[in-house]
Curated annotation (Swiss-Prot):
Function of the protein: Necessary for normal cell division and for the maintenance of normal septation.
Protein name per UniProt: Probable GTP-binding protein EngB
Protein's GO biological process: division septum assembly
Residues annotated as binding GTP: 32-39, 59-63, 81-84, 148-151, 186-188
GO molecular function, one term: metal ion binding
Domain EngB-type G: 24-207
Binding residue positions for Mg(2+): 39, 61
Organism of origin: Burkholderia ambifaria (strain ATCC BAA-244 / DSM 16087 / CCUG 44356 / LMG 19182 / AMMD) (Burkholderia cepacia (strain AMMD))
Entry cofactors: Mg(2+)
One Pfam entry name: MMR_HSR1
Length: 219
């Protein structure tokens, strides 16, 4: 099956909730700390070099960027690139704006069907990552974590990062969280985990045509 994400193009940019497009197509949001490799991961997933742009100044991108996927005449879904978070030098007013924008979007956007959360595999589950999870889990929708830059880890370090992150996510389930919390290793450079991520994302967007033979991700 041709990957749906390979049919992606820029749609629109918004900076306020009131400007969110009145689309009916399902959305998948991509979130992560500044420098977690979010833009690079989106580009690799969509098989494009410059679809999502990384700011030259980390943490300064304050907009929500929409990318439509599927045939240009009749898009079937949207990918939503949320502002990176956690850069220490960002002014307080900007941080407050991001917090309002991100938390409100994640909690209230009815079209949103899941969250892809990027974490640097060398530093997973920071306090800000946990805040993102805690904003979203009340919706009951799934969160899938990509442990990015896993090519920088040894095999044993990768195993430990995956195991420890899954343990941290399991703690939310133990607290009664209903939505699925899954995790995998990912490297845009080595293309590690690319097919696995494709299959999961497309199963959210088009569950009726999801590949039934795909390997399950860690849960």
């Amino acid at each position: 099956m041709a990957f749906l994400l390979h049919q992606a193009r820029f749609y629109t940019t918004v900076n306020h909730l009131r400007d969110l497009p009145p689309t009916v197509q399902p959305e998948i949001a991509f979130a992560g700390r500044s420098n977690a490799g979010k833009s690079t991961a989106i580009n690799v997933l969509c098989n494009q070099k410059r679809l999502a742009f990384a700011s030259k100044t980390p943490g300064r991108t304050q907009h929500i960027n929409y990318f439509s996927v599927g045939p240009a005449a009749e898009p079937v879904a949207n990918l939503v690139d949320l502002p990176g978070y956690g850069y220490a030098e960002v002014p307080g007013a900007a941080k407050a704006h991001w917090e309002m924008l991100l938390s409100s979007y994640l909690a209230t956007r009815s079209q949103l069907c899941g969250l892809i959360l990027m974490m640097d595999s060398r530093r997973p589950l920071t306090d800000l990552d946990r805040r993102m999870i805690e904003w979203f889990v009340p919706t009951g929708k799934p969160i899938h974590t990509l442990l990015t830059k896993c090519d920088k880890l040894t095999r044993q370090e990768s195993i430990n990062a995956l195991r420890n992150t899954q343990k941290g996510l399991d703690a939310y389930r133990d607290q009664g969280v209903k939505g699925k919390l899954t995790v995998q290793l990912f490297s845009a450079l080595k293309r590690t985990g690319l097919d696995e991520a494709h299959e999961l994302i497309e199963s959210w967007l088009r569950p009726s045509v999801a590949d039934e033979k795909s390997e399950p991700v860690a849960q």
